[in-house]
């Protein structure tokens, strides 16, 4: 697992029983797992009175480092023994390693499921409806006779989450849009050939 120096320092800070006593340690671990599952927020970290004795900067660094550690180990699906070995390398006591291992056992499935649906996708166009309208006249001009296309795009953001994009365009604007889309397609094809 490739972890940055900051993350490794944060994990080593968890091993310092003088800086982080057992009650603070348990609170940090509990909060980390529940923040990932969105059952708690980061501000809940400071709700415990025992945390007030710990340096705020060290607490925040340790908290963020352990969140990264959890996410990275879940992302590559590290097994319990690998997690224990890594924590042991960074000087955590066996009781603390066991405590963390129990949380991994308890929340592994839920976190992996949560990570599988936690991603960002641009909306995909799944349907297009259009209608041709004709503006006959306006307040300023007696006769206009301009064709206008009313376009409705149905998009899909995530699983079964649909949205709508509606706009009106003249023939020139529509041709310009088609030209720009074709240009973008060519650029993507060129970049995929290069790589």
Curated annotation (Swiss-Prot):
Locate the COMM domain: which residues? 124-192
- According to its UniProt record, what is one Pfam family this protein matches? COMM_HN
Q: Name one GO biological process term.
A: sodium ion transport
Q: Which CDD domains match?
A: Commd3
Q: Which domain of life is it from?
A: Eukaryota
Q: By its UniProt entry, which InterPro entries does this protein fall under?
A: COMM, COMMD3
PANTHER family, sorted? COMM DOMAIN-CONTAINING PROTEIN 3
The record's family statement is: Belongs to the COMM domain-containing protein 3 family.
The entry's function note states: Scaffold protein in the commander complex that is essential for endosomal recycling of transmembrane cargos; the commander complex is composed of the CCC subcomplex and the retriever subcomplex.
Subunit description: Component of the commander complex consisting of the CCC subcomplex and the retriever subcomplex. Component of the CCC subcomplex.
Full protein name: COMM domain-containing protein 3
Q: What is the originating organism of this protein?
A: Dictyostelium discoideum
């Amino acid at each position: 697992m490739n972890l940055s120096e900051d993350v490794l320092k944060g994990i080593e800070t968890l091993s310092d029983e003088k800086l982080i006593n057992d009650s603070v340690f348990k609170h940090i671990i509990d909060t980390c797992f529940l923040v990932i599952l969105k059952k708690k927020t980061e501000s809940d970290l400071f709700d415990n009175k025992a945390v007030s004795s710990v340096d705020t900067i060290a607490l925040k660094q340790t908290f963020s480092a352990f969140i990264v550690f959890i996410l990275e180990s879940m992302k590559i699906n590290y097994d319990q023994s690998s997690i224990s070995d890594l924590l042991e390398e960074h000087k955590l006591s066996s009781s603390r390693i066991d405590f963390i291992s129990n949380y991994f056992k308890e929340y592994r499935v839920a976190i992996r499921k949560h990570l599988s649906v936690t991603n960002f996708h641009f909306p995909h166009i799944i349907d297009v409806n259009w209608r041709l309208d004709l503006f006959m006249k306006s307040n300023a001009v007696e006769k206009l006779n301009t064709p206008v296309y009313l376009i409705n795009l149905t998009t899909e953001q995530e699983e079964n989450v649909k949205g709508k994009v509606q706009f009106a365009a003249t023939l020139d604007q529509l041709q310009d849009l088609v030209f720009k889309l074709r240009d973008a397609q060519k650029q993507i094809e060129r970049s995929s050939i290069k790589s």
